């Protein structure tokens, strides 16, 4: 496949580097509307937390308007690009929010909001989607409607549902929906996805033990909430090891053990908090049931009262077969390395709510393996790889042109 070049500045060098792209967007690369690297770094300098992405939303809306899209602002930002007479529509989603993390990077575009950081690559996700909007606005070689969905508050699992509750899909009906998430440690531009469950659910639990406090020198006079809590912590681990099938992909983690005890005072109360990840809804429901049974059984044995709360923050993300096949085909057309049946991920994504409403696909794309690009998501020294920006934008454009292809005889010349 012949290639053309899109130039962008290197992170580590003063000279320019060439990013190879397929000829399908050869006519697009002369576009000067958006400097993707500058835009991404601007987003990185000005991170905003979930449901407070006000400056971010304003910047996105202004860019989409400048590109000639119809723009609608609400919980998030929606850009509408129509071409031809086709009645098909697809949605492309990017998340906007940052994390409450102090950045420890030393590059010249570190967060200017201390304690807030784009540590999950949402700055890059937004920029890739805006790049795709620029490509498609300049050369709308498709037939139908593209709905660009810029979503708030992914990190708390609330933004997607908020957009749905606002009636976004009733106002802008789509037949399919797609999202990209970068994957640190994977080779740059490597696309991986799968049909079926790709991201786990996340549930939070809180167990409150009401014992009887007493003097540390006379434990027999009380009901030690710490000892009871420790027994529960150990017993909860048997859910994964003895109650569920091997390979179920369930994780049960106690992350907090809180008491009201003092140096010489046995606590009368203890609180256990933690996190559960599950690949399948039935496993998530089984964990909730078993957690309650185990905790209440141990409490009864010790003669104390107990309460168990179990709340699901993120549901499982389930990719539909048709959109997943489309992603694999588009990635292949772009010459990208593709893993079409990757292992499910243990992290969670509220894009799941979009996939529950319409057939969709979440794909992962490699962020690179060196330096800050290989650091884990949510690490204070993580960074999105700018070399991925044109790759992601070109992929989005390819997917749109594939899924909203013009009727035979109306195809444009993309060479």
Provide a role label for each language-model segment.
Residues 43, 92, 122, 148, ...:
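Divalent metal-coordination and catalytic microenvironments
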Residues 14-30:
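Short, Lys/Arg-enriched N-terminal segments with co-localized hydrophobic residues
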Residues 230-415:
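Metal-dependent amide/peptide-bond hydrolase catalytic core
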Residues 77-80, 99-101, 106-117, 123-124, ...:
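Histidine/acidic-residue-rich, glycine-tolerant segments that coordinate divalent metal ions
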Residues 26-118, 123, 127, 134-142:
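Acidic/His- and Gly-rich active-site-bordering loop/insert found
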Residues 91-93, 102, 205, 362-368:
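Non-cysteine beta-strand/loop elements that form the S-adenosyl-L-methionine
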């Amino acid at each position: 496949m012949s290639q053309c070049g899109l130039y962008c500045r290197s992170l580590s060098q003063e000279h320019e580097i060439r990013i190879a792209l397929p000829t399908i967007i050869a006519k697009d690369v002369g576009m000067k509307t958006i400097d993707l690297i500058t835009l991404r770094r601007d987003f990185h300098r000005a991170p905003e937390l979930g449901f407070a992405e006000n400056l971010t939303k304003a910047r996105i809306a202004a860019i989409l308007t400048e590109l000639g899209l119809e723009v609608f602002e609400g919980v998030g930002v929606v850009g509408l690009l129509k071409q031809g007479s086709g009645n098909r529509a697809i949605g492309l989603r990017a998340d906007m929010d940052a994390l409450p993390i102090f950045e420890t990077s030393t590059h010249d575009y570190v967060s200017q909001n201390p304690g807030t950081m784009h540590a999950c690559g949402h700055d890059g996700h937004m920029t890739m989607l805006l790049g795709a909007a620029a490509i498609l606005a300049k050369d709308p070689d498709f037939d139908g409607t593209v709905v660009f969905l810029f979503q708030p508050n992914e990190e708390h699992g609330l933004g997607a549902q908020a957009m749905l509750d606002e009636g976004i899909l009733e106002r802008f009906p789509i037949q399919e929906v797609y999202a990209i998430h970068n994957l640190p440690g994977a080779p740059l531009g490597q696309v991986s996805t799968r049909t079926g469950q790709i991201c786990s659910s996340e549930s939070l639990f809180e167990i409150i033990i009401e014992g009887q406090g007493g003097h540390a020198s006379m434990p027999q006079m009380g009901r030690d909430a710490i000892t009871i809590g420790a027994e529960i912590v150990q017993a909860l681990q048997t859910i994964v090891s003895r109650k569920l099938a091997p390979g179920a992909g369930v994780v049960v983690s106690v992350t907090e053990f809180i008491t009201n005890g003092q140096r010489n005072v046995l606590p009368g109360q203890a609180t256990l908090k933690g996190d559960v990840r599950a690949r399948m809804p039935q496993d998530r429901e089984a964990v909730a049931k078993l957690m309650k049974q185990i905790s209440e059984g141990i409490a009864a044995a010790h003669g104390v009262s107990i309460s168990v709360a179990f709340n699901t923050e993120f549901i499982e993300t389930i990719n539909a077969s048709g959109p997943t096949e489309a992603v694999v085909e588009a990635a292949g057309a772009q010459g990208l390395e593709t893993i079409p049946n990757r292992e499910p991920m243990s992290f969670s994504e509220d894009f799941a709510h979009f996939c529950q409403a319409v057939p969709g696909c979440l794909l992962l794309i490699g962020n690179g393996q060196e330096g800050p690009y290989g650091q884990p998501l949510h690490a204070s020294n993580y960074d999105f790889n700018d070399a991925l920006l044109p790759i992601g934008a070109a992929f989005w454009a390819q997917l749109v042109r594939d899924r909203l292809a013009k009727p035979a005889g109306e195809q444009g010349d993309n060479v």
